[in-house]
Design a protein with these regions (language model features):
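Extended lipid/amphipathic-ligand handling interfaces
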Residues: 64-67, 88-90, 164-168
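Bacterial Sec signal peptide processing site at the extreme N-terminus
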Residues: 13-36
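Short beta-strand segments that buttress and anchor functional surface loops
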Residues: 49-53, 64, 75-77, 152-156, ...
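A short, Trp-centered hydrophobic/proline-enriched beta-strand micro-motif
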Residues: 37-57
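Flexible, processing/modification-adjacent segments and terminal tails
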Residues: 100-157
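Sec-dependent bacterial lipoprotein signal peptides
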Residues: 1-19
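An acidic-aromatic
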Residues: 72-121
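Gly/Pro-enriched, hydrophobic low-complexity segments
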Residues: 133-196
Length: 196
């Protein structure tokens, strides 16, 4: 084979080898892991929005505010709820509920009142994570993530959470709309404002 012909063959082999598709590295899985860990570690944020709850044969809508300050979560619901609103504060072990009349209930009485008002046991400990678009690290979960490394659905603690919309907040994607379902309970949350 002549030198020009050999050179042409070598160039063709190099071009063909250079054009082959390499498998994508598993960056997305690692990136989701890093994003999830970062958001699960976030302990200061606030949202304002609207919630629609359907539980058994009952339902209501309300404005909602969630404030996370360290391990303390504060939930404020204003709307029908039979009396106009309520405030719930929990640190994961204790629960305090203050109703629209200023009456304060603690622990089991607060849990019973909250369940009666909402129509279901609210997963408050997990909500602080689900609001951020990540699973609660304290229990197993089944996660479905999109190409942007955002949860689209989550199954955890008998709840199914669907994330329908994300909004850009200070350079990162945070949930704008989600639906939580369990048995005969459906909760739709629309976040109108993030303060992270």
């Amino acid at each position: 084979m002549s030198r020009p012909a050999l050179l042409a063959v070598l160039v063709m082999v190099a071009v063909v080898c250079g054009c082959r598709t390499l498998p994508a590295p598993p960056v997305a899985a690692q990136s989701w892991e890093a994003r999830r860990a970062q958001l699960q570690g976030r302990d200061h944020f606030q949202i304002k929005g609207r919630v629609a709850v359907a539980a058994a044969q009952e339902g209501f809508t309300a404005s909602v505010r969630w404030m996370q300050n360290g391990t303390q979560s504060q939930l404020a619901l204003d709307g029908p709820l039979g009396v106009g609103g309520l405030r719930v504060t929990t640190d994961g072990t204790t629960l305090v509920l203050v109703n629209a009349h200023g009456e304060r209930l603690d622990s089991e009485a607060a849990r019973a009142e909250l369940k009666m008002r909402l129509g279901f046991d609210a997963p408050l400990a997990s909500l602080r994570f689900w609001i951020l678009g990540v699973p609660d690290p304290s229990s197993p979960a089944v996660e479905v993530v999109d190409v942007e490394r955002r949860l689209t659905s989550l199954q955890q603690s008998d709840w199914q959470i669907e994330y329908a919309d994300y909004v850009a907040v200070k350079g990162e994607w945070l949930p704008g709309r989600m639906t939580l379902r369990r048995a005969d309970v459906r909760v739709r949350l629309i976040v109108d404002h993030w303060d992270s």
